[in-house]
Amino acid sequence: MFASLARALFGTANDRSLKAFQRRVPEINALEPQVRALDDAALAAKTVEFRQRVAAGTTLDALLPEAFAVAREAARRVLGMRHFDVQLIGGMVLHAGRIAEMRTGEGKTLVATLAVYLSALSGRGVHVVTVNDYLARRDAEEMGKLYAFLGLTTGVIVPNMPDDERRAAYQADITYGTNNEFGFDYLRDNMKYRIEDMVQRPFHHAIVDEVDSILIDEARTPLIISGPAEDSSDLYRSVDTVIHELVKTPEAFEKDEKFRSVILTDAGAEQVEAMLREAGVLIEGGLYDIHNIAVIHHVQQSLRAHTLFARDVDYIVRGGKVVIIDEFTGRMMDGRRYSDGLHQALEAKEHVEIQQENQTLASITFQNYFRLYPKLSGMTGTAMTEADEFAEIYKLDVVEIPTNLPVARKDDDDEVYLTAREKYEAVSTLIEDIAKTPQPVLVGTTSIEKSEYLSELLTKRGIRHNVLNARFHEMEATIVAQAGAPGAITIATNMAGRGTDIKLGGNVEMRIRQELAEIEDPEEHARREAEIRAQVAEYHDIVTKAGGLYVIGTERHESRRIDNQLRGRAGRQGDPGSSRFFISLEDDLMRIFGTERMGGMLQRLGLKEGEAIVHPWINKALERAQKKVEARNFDMRKNTLKYDDVMNDQRKEVYAQRREYMAADDLAATVQDMRTDIIHDMVARRIPERSFAEQWQSAELAEDARGILGLDLPIADWAREDGVDGHAVTERLEQAALQAQAAKAANFGPSVMRYIEKQVLLTTFDSVWKEHLLALDQMRQGIGLRAYGQKDPLNEFKHEAFQLFTAMLDALRLRVTSTMSRVEVAPPVLDNPFAGVAELHADPHVPGLASEPAPGLMTQPVGSYGAATADIAVATPIGASAIMPDDPSSWGETPRNALCPCGSGKKYKHCHGRMG
């Protein structure tokens, strides 16, 4: 009661925010007459003036009224559109680093131009983030005309662009692109080997369109750049054959749809074990024995593929490939793959070619990528329901912008049926009735399967209609643009983020582009254009009189936002419209999250075949169910972020250090420091503090010096000298290593030596980081089990992640030292050190990275000191044969106390020497 009274007296937080922005609107409007009086050249020259003032110390906030007035006038002249007052408020909200919630059709694209123009005056670049490539290209092309008029440059990032074009696009004042492209460019840049090869510049301001889709719906989706791992195609097929039979027995597994999880029962595990043994997959031991852990993993992923993932709902098979469907937008997600072997399990299930598994080389979530921007803002039609999450995770406040005209849409109460069949029959009947009028209909479904089922029902009734789902995504823009034409009936999977407004009467601009594309005669083109415009205007009046767009939802989504986005397709810019949702007790939301009380009450009402119940109480109950789901999903995203933040802190440190290495001209001191640390570790390990020479492990230390430093030193003789202690041995090792490196540098020449040092550092860094990511991922998967031991999994993860990070840095120092001690340069490089030089090592599976090593830089893996074998490029001494870790015949005579050439880190006598 007190909260209601306070709102009545002081207004809501949103009202107070709006008032603060509204105070500046008259100031902008007052400048309009004098700005309109400027000719085109004088108006464009304002940009130069503004930039000079910013350089002189004027803040962007102080420039806002003038800059907005100039941008509004330029839009009027170039685009034929003038910003409304509410759009000015939207621009201010974006400039303030907040989220502007604007209803569909209120001109979000135009609103963004105000904040984009103002931020671009700083000269530091603005990134405008869209949900798909079509929108990025469209907005860059259309709004680019406005920016060009004002003297600003515009770039657009699309897939498969060469790096030179990407770099040019990022150097532009304004850069359009999808969230995927921006994120992948960030990861690729941090895998480059030269600063000048990077494409992005330091981040400044990102304005995210459909911000809820990107920062909420896709928050837990990591962007991953991966390289090939070992091929397990045969194992996937064998396991799939077993699981295909197993899922016919419901008692063999337990499925939890609410949490999207499935496990084998004891009976199921016994059945799988017997079937795998019969198939020859399980050769020894039980299913859960440690040496069969890979088989368990394949079984679990295959079980998930068969029980939790449905064809035409979660994915489709297209062109012999399994393509993921975005659960929020219904679009195909080409290029994306499920990780951890799940995608391969789906390929085995669908009997298509199984692609090779990948190992993560670099990854980041959208949550952490967008938090890299010093300034972040966004816009969407539906954000208020997730305002708490935006505030808590991104520190972004949501401001609801009032519509320019009152919303005239009529939202009817839901109709609830007992079965899905009755529900779809009722929907078909309603569409059949509306089809007798000019009123257009948009029907929203939750999957391809359901959209095609409804399409069949309408076809049987002889009702003409269009279907928009992932199968027909090429026709998306055309279908959506004409969904408001008289009599149009459109069935669409999730309409979220479609980006094209449904205009009553049809989209005149798109019709002109499509129908007049091949007409070259100017007079004929003008005549036909006038006819189309007149016809669309007539159609607009017809549809308006018929009641506007009728939106039908065939199922409630887990998120209220998706429902609101579907409703919001009707009633844009004050147009009339209607919406109604049809629901059944068999729908996923009702079946999984609905209350037993609701189902019991509907059963007691004794509904007959085809009857529905319509009551506001039902709507409230459904909203409560949706809120429960939203709260659960928020908790899951928040929990994921806590773990991801641990890795994110490490990622930022690694990328910053790597960038320092790339930018440095001379890394000799860094390499020397690493070598010194390794020598200190070696000596401390073999010569205990305050020990006698008889207690030293002199032979082992000599082997370490040979294996790691490439030095054959008389350490046993040193031990017999008077007055020699561990410190003296350390100094002698350091001096010997320094002299060896100095001799190499003199032999190679300074330029080649500096080049090799940088390449060895970068490639080794990439190698240990890749292994570290794998270790973190494996630890993350099992860390939740620590809760059974009364330990906090998050604290355990933080502690062990730090230990792994420390071990990674130790491995980096070791491998760099070992590699630099053995690297040699073949004669062709000595003659011409930079002839055809490319990166020493780069993964050929990472787009945009060089994959050929420099001519003459040969490779030989080296043994490690307490770490895994290096997989980086080092050189075999000239005249020596290469030692191959997997080929014992290439090892020659190996001393029994030396490190094993296989790279295990063990002594030869305890490794392959023992087996020999």
Curated annotation (Swiss-Prot):
May bind 1 zinc ion per subunit. Its main location: membrane. It is found in: Cell inner membrane; Cytoplasm. ATP binds at residues 87, 105-109, 501. One of its GO terms (cellular component) is cytosol. Keywords: ATP-binding, Cell inner membrane, Cell membrane, Cytoplasm, Membrane, Metal-binding, Nucleotide-binding, Protein transport, Translocase, Translocation, Transport, Zinc. Disulfide bonds: none annotated. InterPro entries: Helicase_ATP-bd, Helicase_C-like, P-loop_NTPase, SEC_C_motif, SecA, SecA_CS, SecA_DEAD, SecA_motor_DEAD. One of its GO terms (biological process) is protein import. It comes from the Bacteria. It is an enzyme of class 7 (translocase). Zn(2+) binds at residues 900, 902, 911-912. It is a peripheral membrane protein. SMART domains: SecA_DEAD, SecA_PP_bind. It holds the Pfam family SecA_PP_bind. Its cofactor is Zn(2+). Belongs to the SecA family. NCBIfam families: PRK12904.1, secA. Monomer and homodimer. Part of the essential Sec protein translocation apparatus which comprises SecA, SecYEG and auxiliary proteins SecDF-YajC and YidC. Part of the Sec protein translocase complex. Interacts with the SecYEG preprotein conducting channel. Has a central role in coupling the hydrolysis of ATP to the transfer of proteins into and across the cell membrane, serving both as a receptor for the preprotein-SecB complex and as an ATP-driven molecular motor driving the stepwise translocation of polypeptide chains across the membrane. This is Protein translocase subunit SecA. It comes from Gluconacetobacter diazotrophicus (strain ATCC 49037 / DSM 5601 / CCUG 37298 / CIP 103539 / LMG 7603 / PAl5).
